């Protein structure tokens, strides 16, 4: 009996050793891939190497799920003719900016032509100058208007969200969309497979039965694992009849109406756009939809790109970023805005984990006399991200940056306002995930009134916020310091 046990133990040791050796070899292969085969920052390389070294059995699994980079040419393919048409618009606008004969005399457009040119050149983010914008900071008002616009649709509704919850608000909106589909309106929903995992097929049955079309972005081909879970479509876009567009931070669900016991009031920022910028949102939706739809592709007919007479005069560029792009366009837009600041910078972001160069640009502005204000949440939805955000924001205090914690629920707003003149609102957080891994979309706005409105929203939020002073930060416990340190170490892969 003892001899049998000895043989069994010997065989089990051989099996365990084989598993460890196999895991070690896999980790080496993945380490080799990270260092030599993929384009990454040095910080990201070191973070993944630490994971692979200290988690030899699970490191390669984490890398498969969260670390793999997708080749750009495997994501989106734009027809040559469509690309040629877009390039023609961009070339015309670049020439106009270079010759200083742009048809619109908007002061902001003339002053910030270098930034406009950068977004044009890197992202084909063509400039539109005839827009009218409405700013939302409250979910109830935003969804009331959205539902009314859905009810008024006559031709088509293109509806894209990262999260669509299968709850009261989610079902209400899906029901309204289904009604329009029954009336003969073309209704297409594009949802992220991970973000909307509570919805997926069952929650969409009534909508589809009424004639609506829905597609998942990067759906999992395996029952429990999504090997593309690290690259999610975080965009929120609605286009109605080519006349009205929505873009911003709100997802669809009761949580975003302030009904979550965990988060309470949900503070976010969203835009309703009427004008030619809607065409840019439409183009982004079509590219995303056609990349995922196996059939039922959307054409580039004039029907989807009508002339819009908004009566507005606001300049807007719609910029996208994601792993399919060569440049980190939204990040570059943020950096260009920050470097142009002369008087003030107002930032709201739930996740503030940029790279050191980004942090240095903010420090340089503050040390140069610019009034820099940053607002972050005071409660975590993702603990590691929360502590890394706190440490990064606090690192700016010595440079004179003022940091505020939003105390009235959860802050999810992604806004940047410079000198009461230009602003950005969209889906991109100020972190590595938004800049590099996820698919994002932002509106860059050249208008004093909108910039002042967004700045005033920040100032109004100060009434329900608390300042993070150096003295207050110095009193944090050793346990918090430890959590900050670990989170900071992992921040390149959060």
Swiss-Prot record:
Bilayer topology term: Multi-pass membrane protein
Subcellular location: Cell membrane
UniProt keyword Ligase present: no
NCBIfam families: bac_cardiolipin (TIGR04265)
EC number(s) stated in the UniProt entry for this protein: 2.7.8.-
Transmembrane stretches, start-end: 14-34, 45-65
Organism: Staphylococcus aureus (strain MRSA252)
The family this protein is said to belong to: Belongs to the phospholipase D family. Cardiolipin synthase subfamily.
A single GO BP: cardiolipin biosynthetic process
Keywords: Cell membrane, Lipid biosynthesis, Lipid metabolism, Membrane, Phospholipid biosynthesis, Phospholipid metabolism, Repeat, Transferase, Transmembrane, Transmembrane helix
Presence of keyword Plastid: no
GO MF annotations in UniProt: cardiolipin synthase activity
PROSITE patterns: PLD
Domain PLD phosphodiesterase, chain residue ranges per copy: 229-256, 407-434
SMART domains (UniProt xref): PLDc (SM00155)
PANTHER family xref list: CARDIOLIPIN SYNTHASE (PTHR21248), PHOSPHOLIPASE D (PTHR21248:SF22)
Cellular component annotations (GO), alphabetically ordered: plasma membrane
Protein task: Catalyzes the reversible phosphatidyl group transfer from one phosphatidylglycerol molecule to another to form cardiolipin (CL) (diphosphatidylglycerol) and glycerol.
Active site residues of this protein: 234, 236, 241, 412, 414, 419
InterPro entries with a match to the protein in the record: Cardiolipin_synth_Firmi, Cardiolipin_synthase, CLS_N, PLD-like_dom, PLipase_D/transphosphatidylase
HAMAP family hit by this protein: Cardiolipin_synth_Cls
Annotated catalysed reactions: 2 a 1,2-diacyl-sn-glycero-3-phospho-(1'-sn-glycerol) = a cardiolipin + glycerol
Protein's recorded name: Cardiolipin synthase 2
A family per Pfam: PLDc_2
């Amino acid at each position: 009996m003892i001899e049998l046990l000895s043989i069994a133990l010997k065989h089990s040791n051989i099996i365990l050793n084989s598993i460890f050796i196999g895991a070690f070899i896999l980790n080496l292969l993945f380490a080799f891939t990270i260092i030599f085969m993929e384009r990454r920052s040095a910080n990201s390389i070191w973070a993944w190497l630490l994971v692979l070294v200290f988690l030899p059995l699970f490191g390669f699994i984490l890398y498969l799920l969260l670390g793999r980079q997708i080749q750009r040419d495997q994501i989106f393919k734009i027809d040559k003719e469509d690309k040629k048409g877009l390039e023609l618009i961009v070339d015309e606008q670049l020439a106009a900016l270079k010759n200083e004969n742009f048809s619109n005399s908007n002061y902001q457009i003339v002053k910030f032509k270098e930034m406009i040119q950068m977004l044009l050149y890197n992202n084909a983010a063509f400039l539109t100058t005839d827009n009218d914008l409405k700013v939302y900071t409250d979910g109830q008002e935003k969804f009331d208007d959205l539902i009314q616009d859905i009810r008024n649709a006559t031709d088509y509704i293109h509806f894209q969200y990262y999260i669509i919850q299968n709850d009261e608000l989610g079902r209400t909106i899906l029901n309204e969309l289904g009604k329009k589909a029954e009336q003969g309106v073309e209704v297409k929903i594009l949802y992220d497979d991970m973000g909307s995992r509570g919805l997926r097929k069952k929650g969409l049955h009534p909508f589809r039965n009424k004639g609506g079309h829905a597609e998942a972005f990067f759906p999992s081909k395996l029952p429990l694992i999504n090997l593309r879970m690290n690259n999610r479509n975080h965009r929120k876009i609605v286009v109605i009849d080519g006349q009205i567009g929505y873009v911003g931070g709100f997802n669809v669900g009761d949580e975003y109406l302030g009904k979550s016991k965990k988060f309470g009031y949900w503070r976010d920022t969203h835009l309703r756009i009427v004008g030619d910028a809607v065409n840019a949102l439409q183009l982004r939706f079509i590219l995303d939809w056609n990349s995922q739809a196996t059939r039922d592709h959307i054409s580039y007919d004039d029907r989807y790109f009508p002339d819009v007479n908004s009566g507005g005069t606001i300049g807007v560029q719609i910029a996208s970023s994601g792993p399919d792009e060569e440049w980190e366009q939204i990040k570059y837009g943020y950096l260009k805005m920050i470097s142009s600041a002369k008087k003030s910078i107002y930032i709201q972001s739930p996740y503030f984990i940029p790279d050191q160069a980004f942090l240095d640009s903010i420090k340089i502005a503050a040390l140069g006399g610019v009034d820099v204000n940053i607002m972050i949440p005071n409660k975590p939805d993702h603990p590691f991200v929360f502590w890394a955000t706190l440490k990064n924001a606090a690192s700016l205090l010595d440079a004179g940056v003022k940091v505020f914690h939003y105390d009235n629920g959860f802050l999810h707003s992604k806004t940047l306002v410079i000198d009461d003149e230009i602003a950005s609102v969209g889906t991109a957080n100020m972190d590595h995930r938004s800049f590099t891994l996820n698919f994002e979309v932002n509106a860059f706005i050249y208008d004093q009134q909108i910039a002042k409105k967004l700045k005033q929203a920040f100032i109004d939020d100060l009434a329900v916020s608390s300042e993070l002073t150096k003295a207050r930060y110095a009193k944090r416990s050793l346990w918090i310091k430890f959590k900050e340190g670990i989170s900071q170490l992992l921040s390149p892969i959060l």
